[in-house]
A protein has these predicted regions:
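NAD(P)+-binding Rossmann beta1-loop-alpha1 motif at the extreme N-terminus of oxidoreductases
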Residues: 1-53, 60, 126-127, 189-190
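Internal alpha-helical scaffold of NAD(P)-dependent oxidoreductase catalytic cores
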Residues: 102-112, 128-165, 178-215, 264
Length: 264
């Protein structure tokens, strides 16, 4: 199986690194294209894959093509490569807001397409990726794509109408989490903790809390209640968060993200 990556930025690099680390595809069977020769050489040195500046070469030589350029570049790049794609290939799109119908229309001929939405924790092998196979993709082919996506984290298949919501919860929410960690650390610093230790405690607390929820399968509300002793300091702090609409504000942020993604 030969894989192609058109655009080899951070996200493509994370996907490639995960695939190689898991031994799913060898580096010499992975092709990547960059906009400049300098970037192509850097990608080759970093990942050991074959690189070029020719997008059409990658499209023509690959069984599965990952389109990893910026959303605003999609139309131009698709116009460039569409005549080099054939109906047996799978095109994997990682751009938010680009629907299967939009992609199919721009390609202009029958094409197997999988729409995916990874997030930045993929860079450390802990990504969350929602994916939606098009009608021409067989269950066996969808399984192959899922296995590739699972090389750098969790992969969840969804119906396409849910992809923008998944993009908000998975793709944009790391920014919310980083803000929360920063705010926790700021509170610790305000109470005398050194910055480095405050950030470490906050980050590990978020990591441990998430792991506990995933491993126990408990509802987050139940786990929250277990920490809140009657009349204790934790329930007092939860009350303060609720006074400032912590959950409501987060929910509105997710919905704002979805609205923006749909407008791209």
């Amino acid at each position: 199986m030969r894989l192609g990556f058109i655009g080899c930025g951070n996200m493509a690099g994370a996907i490639i690194a995960g695939i190689i680390k898991k031994g799913l595809v060898s580096p010499d069977e992975i092709y990547g294209s960059n906009s400049t020769l300098e970037h192509a050489n850097t990608t080759h040195e970093r990942l050991g894959i074959q690189t070029t500046t020719d997008n059409t070469l990658v499209a023509g030589e690959s069984d599965i093509v990952f389109l990893c350029v910026k959303p605003q570049q999609y139309e131009a790049v698709i116009d460039q490569i569409k005549d080099h794609l054939h109906e047996r290939q799978i095109l994997v799109s990682i751009a938010p807001g680009k629907t299967l119908a939009w992609l199919g229309e721009k390609i202009g001929h029958p094409q197997k397409i999988v729409r995916v939405m990874p997030n930045t924790p993929a860079l450390v092998g802990e990504g969350t990726t929602a994916f939606c196979p098009g009608d021409l993709v067989s269950p066996e082919e969808a399984k192959i794509v899922k296995e590739l996506l699972e090389s750098f984290g969790l992969a969840i298949e969804l119906a396409e109408p849910l992809m923008d919501a998944a993009s908000a919860v998975g793709g944009s929410a790391p920014a919310f989490v980083y803000m929360f960690i920063e705010a926790l650390a700021d509170g610790g610093v305000a109470e005398g903790l050194p910055r480095a230790q405050a950030q470490m405690i906050a980050a590990q607390t978020v990591l441990g809390s998430a792991k506990m929820m995933l491993e126990t399968g408990e509802h987050p509300g139940k786990l929250k209640d277990q920490v809140c002793s009657p009349g204790g300091s934790t329930i007092a702090s939860v009350e303060t968060l609720e006074e400032w609409s912590f959950r409501g504000t987060t929910t509105r942020a997710v919905r704002a993200t979805v609205a923006k993604a749909r407008s791209l």
